[in-house]
Curated annotation (Swiss-Prot):
It is found in: Cytoplasm. This is PF03932 family protein CutC. GO terms for molecular function: copper ion binding. Belongs to the CutC family. GO terms for cellular component: cytoplasm. Keywords: Cytoplasm. The lineage of its organism: Bacteria, Pseudomonadati, Pseudomonadota, Gammaproteobacteria, Enterobacterales. NCBIfam families: PRK11572.1. HAMAP family: CutC. It comes from Yersinia pseudotuberculosis serotype O:1b (strain IP 31758). Its main location: cytoplasm. The keyword Amino-acid biosynthesis does not apply.
Length: 254
C-alpha cells in the first residue's frame, strides 16, 4: 500500500499527523523557506512524544543546495545529533556548483548518518540531469528520493516521476512524490505506481491572541499576517490515508 508522509513544521503538527494516521513525519521549521533544520528542543520533544517514524530535515538555510564549509560542518553535526537521539531517518541533500549530486559530501553524510534511513530531498529537482542523479543516489544507497519530477508541483512532473519509478522498479531508492500532492489529485500518483506520497496536508489557522498589534510584522513584508500560522489538518490526513487504503490492491479485492 502507498505510504503517506506528512510534512510538519512543529511538534504539534507531528502529533496531529500521527493521530490522523500518517505513516511518517518529515519534521522541519521555516515554512516560508521551504523547510529548515528543526531546533534541538523540537527534536527532543518529537522524539519523546511521537511514536511513528520521524525524519527531521537537515537544511541550514534557505536558497540553493551548494553549501559553504561552515554550512556543511553544521549539517554533519546536526545529522550526528539526530542519529544519536535515535530517529528513524534524516532528510538531506547537497549539490555541487554545476547542479550535480555532490558525491564526496554525500558520501560523508552517508557515513555520519550510520543506520539512519536517508531521504534525498527536493535538491533532486534542481539537478541538471535527473537520471544521472538517480544513478548516483542509488550508488550512495539512499533510502528514498523526494521529488516533484523537476517541476513546480508533482502533478506537472508526473511524466518524469513515472520514468523514475520504472527505473527503480527492481532496485534502487523509493521514489516519493511531493509538492502539491493533495487529496484531490493523489489518485493520479497511486495509479502511476508511486509507493510513497509527501504532503503538508495543512491549513492556515488563526492566532489565539485576543490583543493584536496592528502595523507591525516580524519580516520585511508589511502585508504578512502575524496572527495566523500553518498547521496540519487532521481531517485531511485522515481522508488521504483512507483513500490510500481503499486504493490498495488488497482493498480492491476484498
Amino acid at each position: 500500500m502507498t505510504k503517506l508522509e506528512v510534512c510538519c513544521y512543529s511538534v504539534d503538527c507531528a502529533q496531529i499527523a500521527e493521530k490522523a494516521g500518517a505513516d511518517r513525519v518529515e519534521l522541519c521549521c521555516g515554512q516560508s523557506e521551504g523547510g529548515l533544520t528543526p531546533s534541538v528542543g523540537a527534536l527532543i520533544q518529537a522524539r519523546e512524544t511521537v511514536t511513528i517514524p520521524v525524519h527531521p530535515i537537515v537544511r541550514p538555510r534557505g536558497g540553493d543546495f551548494c553549501y559553504s564549509s561552515n554550512d556543511f560542518t553544521i549539517m554533519k553535526n546536526d545529522i550526528a545529533r539526530i542519529r544519536d537521539l535515535g530517529f528513524a531517518g534524516v532528510v538531506v541533500g547537497v549539490l555541487d556548483t554545476d547542479g550535480h549530486i555532490d558525491m564526496p559530501r554525500m558520501r560523508e553524510i552517508m557515513s555520519v548518518s550510520g543506520s539512519l534511513a536517508v531521504t534525498f530531498h527536493r535538491a533532486f529537482d534542481m539537478c541538471q540531469n535527473p537520471m544521472i542523479a538517480l544513478k548516483q543516489l542509488a550508488e550512495l544507497n539512499v533510502a528514498r528520493i523526494l521529488t516533484s519530477g523537476q517541476q513546480q508541483n508533482a502533478e506537472l512532473g508526473l511524466a518524469l516521476l513515472k520514468d523514475l519509478v520504472a527505473a527503480t522498479k527492481d532496485q534502487g531508492p523509493i521514489i516519493m512524490a511531493g509538492a502539491g500532492v493533495r487529496l484531490t489529485n493523489m489518485q493520479k500518483f497511486i495509479d502511476a505506481g508511486i509507493r510513497e506520497l509527501h504532503s503538508s496536508a495543512g491549513r492556515t489557522v488563526p492566532s489565539t491572541m485576543r490583543y493584536r498589534k496592528a502595523g507591525v510584522t516580524m519580516c520585511a513584508d508589511s502585508d504578512v499576517d502575524e496572527f495566523s500560522h500553518y498547521c496540519v489538518d487532521g481531517e485531511v490526513v485522515e481522508a488521504m490515508k483512507s483513500l490510500l487504503v481503499m486504493g490498495s490492491p488488497l482493498a480492491k479485492h476484498t
